[in-house]
Design a protein with these regions (language model features):
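Condensing-enzyme catalytic core mediating Claisen C-C bond formation in acyl metabolism
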Residues: 1-30, 128-209, 214, 251-267, ...
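Claisen-condensing/thiolase-fold acyl-transfer catalytic domains that form or cleave C-C bonds
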Residues: 1-10, 38, 64-65, 71-109, ...
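Phosphate/pyrophosphate-binding loops at sites that engage ATP/ADP/AMP, CoA/4′-phosphopantetheine
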Residues: 40-55, 207-221, 289-290
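Short, well-ordered, mixed-charge alpha-helical segments that flank or form enzyme active sites
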Residues: 67-68, 118-123, 159, 185-189, ...
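Membrane-interface helix-loop-helix junctions at boundaries between adjacent transmembrane segments
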Residues: 107, 121, 130-131
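Disulfide-rich extracellular domains of secreted proteins
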Residues: 204, 215-219, 229-233
Length: 307
């Protein structure tokens, strides 16, 4: 699910739901983000052929205080909910925990959801929308969007209506979460909320180095490494930090914040950000290529600045 600005970006053709009004029919920006989460979960149920009762747990989060977008957006479905806050890394956190839950045998089907909204994030973290502040080139544009994913122990789903059963192929039989490296808090003392790429890049570098060591990764193993929202500024810092560690990923690396907008045409400075940034790019760019076998192994590194 994406907003109007995201629709005009390079991935605009690939979203399932786009509203012509970034309020999504709501009465406030917070209400709009709740509706985005609800729409994303509804679309997940539609595409998988499931009912809410088929989902054992939901792991979900957003950027707002007390996770109000998540709690109000998902309350009507009556599904056990774990509310998560990992700033803009929430999509990775929810997928990681969902995969652990399924792999450990605690659930068969778990939903992982994350959302953000430009206007609600600006209102809470930065400046009033009518203030008209100047944005430095290192700043990023919070994505209005949400992604909902099913983590399941079965590549196909059996749906029964009375005595009649049918097989629903979710189309992602070849896409699995084969391993997880959990990031640590890495703080270089950056305090500029208009330069989150610089704040997050050291943590991303630390995680990628840890992943290479944990899984004994050699050059050529991954077809793509994609971070969440370092943007153009954070990208260069990340590549520099990794080269200092003896790791060169420049030929396979990109960032969700870079992919979601055209910075020259859309005036988005360093790129996109927010929980919704990695949430919508993961499906429209990464999973689509995995499903088509254009990519075989991807390291997905959503990043968050706990400023």
């Amino acid at each position: 699910v994406a907003g109007t600005k995201e629709k005009k970006g390079p991935l605009g053709c690939c979203f399932d739901v786009v509203s012509q009004d970034d309020l999504f029919g709501g009465e406030s920006w917070e209400d709009a983000e709740s509706r985005i989460q609800s729409l994303a979960f509804e679309k997940l149920l539609e595409k998988t052929g499931m009912m809410p009762d088929d989902i054992r747990y939901i792991y979900a989060g957003d950027l707002l205080g007390q996770l109000i977008a998540t709690s109000f957006g998902l309350k009507t479905y009556d599904v056990p909910l774990f509310g998560l806050y990992g700033a803009c890394s929430t999509m990775g956190e929810s997928l990681s925990l969902a995969a652990m839950c399924v792999n450990a045998g605690f659930a068969d089907n778990v939903a992982a959801i994350a959302s953000s909204h430009f206007a609600s994030a600006e209102k809470q973290f930065r400046f009033p929308l009518l203030y008209g502040n100047q944005r430095p080139m290192s700043s990023t544009w919070t994505v209005t969007g949400a992604g909902a994913y099913l983590v399941s122990n079965s590549p196909v789903i059996t749906k029964c209506d009375g005595d009649v059963c049918r097989i629903v192929d979710n189309g992602y039989a070849n896409v699995i979460i084969s391993g997880i490296t959990t990031g640590k808090i890495v703080d270089y003392g950056v305090k500029d909320s208009m330069n989150m790429g610089a704040c997050m890049a050291p943590a991303a570098a630390d995680l990628i180095e840890a992943n290479y060591k944990d899984f004994e990764v050699t050059k050529g193993y991954y077809d793509m490494i994609i971070t969440g929202d370092l943007g153009y500024t954070g990208k260069e810092i990340l590549l520099t930090l990794l080269k200092e560690k003896g790791i060169d990923i420049s030929d396979i690396y990109t960032d969700c914040g870079i992919e979601v907008f055209d910075k020259n045409e859309q005036d988005t400075q360093s790129g996109g950000s927010g929980c919704g940034c990695s949430a919508i790019v993961l499906d429209t760019l990464v999973l689509d290529k995995l499903r088509k076998r254009e990519l075989k192994r991807v390291l997905f590194v959503p990043t968050g600045a706990l400023l």
